[in-house]
């Protein structure tokens, strides 16, 4: 069974161009497993990465090596034995920091192992090999190297709640007219707000384009500075000057990255404003549709009211004719009653005379 790695992660692997000593050349088409191993037979620590069956990194860690973070997700180190500079691009700053911590830890372990080895050689005693906890003394295999990183990014889901629509109840004509006026006023207000939001949206779009141009310029400048740092680090004859320039350039890169972060936050804010403007536009369209429905309802109520008025007028005319007929009948009845009264009086007089 192959020797197990002490620590593994995944990253994109690069090497410095051996001709120009400036540009990075990718040695893997995608992220591969990069692992730390302890070679107990030679008492050294190694960084090994395989792309299939091909070893794209086989670097022995020495006490004088330094792992440098050149950005939030990129780090590099120079291997004088392999006469090259390795670069690793990680998926997050956390993975880069973890790899750098392990590099420093195993670098210190390599220094201590070297000192112990020298002391034992001076004492001409048989060296005892001590392996790191959990390591197996067996040859390295691709199967043992290509592990998986134990860092996982949780998925985030977004839940949206549907908005309840108000119920449409039948309204009397007077109430319906009041609601219609209310919706018209609301629509006028929304039109004014929509005009303001449209202007703000156009301004935000122009600002986004400007930020993107500045962002591209900053990224290009940061890439140029990264290449410059790599070039300076590879020139061993100018170590002091390289260190000074490297510090200045790293500071400049950090400032540029902070500026980029601020610009990205500004872009996110502008995107949020655009989303809000779109939401208000959707609300305006919904209110416009509701207003149209209310207007249609008003027309229906007006038709019903006109029909009721005609029916009422017809009923009133019929009642007036009935009253006139009744009045005529009453007058005739009064005449008949008067005649009957006279007849009764005359009959009474005849009875008295007889």
From Swiss-Prot:
Sites of Phosphoserine modification: 306
Pfam family, one: WH1
Residues that bear N-acetylglycine: 2
Single GO cellular component term: dendritic spine
BP terms from Gene Ontology: behavioral response to cocaine; chemical synaptic transmission; G protein-coupled glutamate receptor signaling pathway; phospholipase C-activating G protein-coupled glutamate receptor signaling pathway; positive regulation of calcium ion transport; positive regulation of signal transduction; protein tetramerization; regulation of calcium ion import
Family label: Belongs to the Homer family.
Name by which UniProt lists this protein: Homer protein homolog 1
Species annotation: Homo sapiens (Human)
Gene that produces this protein: HOMER1
């Amino acid at each position: 069974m192959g020797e197990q790695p002490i620590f593994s992660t995944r990253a994109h692997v690069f090497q410095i161009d051996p001709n120009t000593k400036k540009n990075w050349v990718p040695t893997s088409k995608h992220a591969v497993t990069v692992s730390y191993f302890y070679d107990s037979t030679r008492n050294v620590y190694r960084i090994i990465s395989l792309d299939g069956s091909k070893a794209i990194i086989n670097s022995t860690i020495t006490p004088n090596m330094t792992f440098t973070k050149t950005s939030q997700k990129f780090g590099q180190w120079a291997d004088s034995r392999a006469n090259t500079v390795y670069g690793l691009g990680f998926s997050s700053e956390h993975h880069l920091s973890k790899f750098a911590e392990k590099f420093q830890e195993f670098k210190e372990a390599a220094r201590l192992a070297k000192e112990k080895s020298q002391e034992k050689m001076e004492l001409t005693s048989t060296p005892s090999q001590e392996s790191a906890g959990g390591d197996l003394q067996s040859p390295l295999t691709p199967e043992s190297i290509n592990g998986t990183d134990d860092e996982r990014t949780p998925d985030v889901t977004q839940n949206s709640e549907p908005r309840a629509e108000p119920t449409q109840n039948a309204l009397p004509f007077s109430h319906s007219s009041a609601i219609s006026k209310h919706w018209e006023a609301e629509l006028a207000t929304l039109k004014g707000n929509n005009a303001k939001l449209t202007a703000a949206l156009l301004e935000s779009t122009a600002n986004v384009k400007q930020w993107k141009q500045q962002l591209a310029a900053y990224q290009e400048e940061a890439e140029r500075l990264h290449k410059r740092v790599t070039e300076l680090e590879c020139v061993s004859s100018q170590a002091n000057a390289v260190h000074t320039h490297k510090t200045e350039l790293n500071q400049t890169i950090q400032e540029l990255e902070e500026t980029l972060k601020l610009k990205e936050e500004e872009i996110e804010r502008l995107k949020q404003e655009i989303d809000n403007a779109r939401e208000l536009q959707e609300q305006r369209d919904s209110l416009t549709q509701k207003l149209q429905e209310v207007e249609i309802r008003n027309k229906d109520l007006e038709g019903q009211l006109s029909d009721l008025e005609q029916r009422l007028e017809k009923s009133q005319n019929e009642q007036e004719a009935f009253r006139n007929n009744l009045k005529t009948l009453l007058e005739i009845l009064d005449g008949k009653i008067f005649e009957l009264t006279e007849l009764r009086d005359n009959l009474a007089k005849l009875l008295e005379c007889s």
